[in-house]
Swiss-Prot record:
Signal peptide start and end residues: 1-20
Keyword Translocase in annotation: no
GO BP terms, alphabetized: defense response to bacterium; killing of cells of another organism
Locations listed in the record: Secreted
One cellular component term from this protein's GO annotations in UniProt: extracellular region
Originating organism: Magallana gigas (Pacific oyster)
InterPro entries referenced in this protein's UniProt entry, alphabetically: Invert_lysozyme, Lysozyme-like_dom_sf
Family: Belongs to the glycosyl hydrolase 22 family. Type-I lysozyme subfamily.
Protein name: Lysozyme
MF terms in GO: lysozyme activity
Gene designation: lysoz
Amino acid sequence: MQRLLGSIVILATVFTFCEATISSACLRCICNVESGCRPIGCHYDVYSYSCGYFQIKENYWEDCGKPGTSFKACANDYTCASNCVRAYMKRYIGSSGCPANCESYARIHNGGPRGCRHPSTLRYWEKVHQQGCNVNS
């Protein structure tokens, strides 16, 4: 019985860790960096278009599960775009090798699935941090 309870505690801990999600505060800081948190449309940026509140690229939208009616429509709708970012983070934080915190989420948003491990995303994190977020936001 004690062994069974120990297994349940371990499974609950693993489940909780895997279910970590990006906070609304962290989302807002990323949104502020990307667009001033406005639906600014699409701009050509690094070989493809980046659109909307979070300047989402089409492959990012595909990775988050293609919510909404289209890539551009979702990116320019705050609720849809936020849900896309949440789904993207949920998909990749566990395999990134980084802790589930605002810094990791921001760096993954900027640098892709393992962006939290790339030194090139530290500058982006500083911009997010300047919006009032910290690692634990």
